Amino acid sequence: MTGKTQTSNVTNKNDPKSINSRVFIGNLNTAIVKKVDIEAIFSKYGKIVGCSVHKGYAFVQYMSERHARAAVAGENARVIAGQPLDINMAGEPKPYRPKPGNKRPLSALYRLESKEPFLSVGGYVFDYDYYRDDFYNRLFDYHGRVPPPPRAVIPLKRPRVAVTTTRRGKGVFSMKGGSRSTASGSTGSKLKSDELQTIKKELTQIKTKIDSLLGRLEKIEKQQKAEAEAQKKQLEESLVLIQEECVSEIADHSTEEPAEGGPDADGEEMTDGIEEDFDEDGGHELFLQIK
């Protein structure tokens, strides 16, 4: 946001003057950083003639080469939107420095020999292959600065004479590892044995409690059975007594009834009748005496 008129998008002029005053900005987070932001950052080094923003990189065209080199020296490796910028002169691509284990891409070898180096993208023409390959080369170099994670060392083949020593070394290592594993296994077995003993103690305590409860239940059952038998005997004895009393009462009643209605009673009735006859007739006694 400089307040100046907006610069053009043309940064692809092929004259030597414009190429030498052109700055390449790589590793740019174009999703966040816009053209206005780039112009605001780089306008302090000199007048900007053109600025073109692409996906992941951008170009800034200055009026003079001195301004472009000042921008490269001042803004290279600056962190914007979480990414360090890779800034270089567009006319002087970063020289390729081969590293051990890395191969140079074929596109970098045949970049200058392309028959169709200029393509039309977004309404204007620029050397796409040249800057794309140069940008990715710089990007790979930047990522190559970060040390890779350590890789497992593959043992080289040795002659048969040294095989015995390696086997012995392996044997010693395996024995050491075996001792460590046995030590860890012994500690684990000790822990397991302690846990088993505690569980065994708890189980024995539970068993004793259950046995005591069962004994109490048996005692209660025996007491209940004894009480039930005693009650049963009492009921039987009471029933027998009641039966005996009933039988004795019946026998008493049967013996008392014939005594009341026997011969004495008939004699009394007869005498009573005689007396009545005697009283009524008056002289009946005399008649009996005469007889």
From Swiss-Prot:
Q: Where is this region: Disordered?
A: 171-192, 249-291
Show where the RRM domain sits. 21-92
Composition bias, Acidic residues: 257-282
- GO MF annotation: an example: identical protein binding
Q: Which family does it belong to?
A: Belongs to the RRM HNRPC family. RALY subfamily.
> What organism does this protein naturally occur in?
Homo sapiens
- Keywords in alphabetical order, please: Coiled coil, RNA-binding
Q: Which residues form a coiled coil?
A: 190-249
Q: What protein is this chain from?
A: RNA-binding Raly-like protein
Q: Name one Pfam family in it.
A: RRM_1
Q: Matching SMART domains, A to Z?
A: RRM (SM00360)
* UniProt feature, compositional bias: Low complexity: 177-189
* Cellular component GO terms, alphabetical: nucleoplasm; nucleus
Expression by tissue: Widely expressed, with highest levels in brain.
InterPro entries, alphabetized: hnRNP_C (IPR017347), Nucleotide-bd_a/b_plait_sf (IPR012677), RBD_domain_sf (IPR035979), RRM_dom (IPR000504), RRM_HNRPC/RALY_subfam (IPR051186)
- The gene behind this protein is RALYL
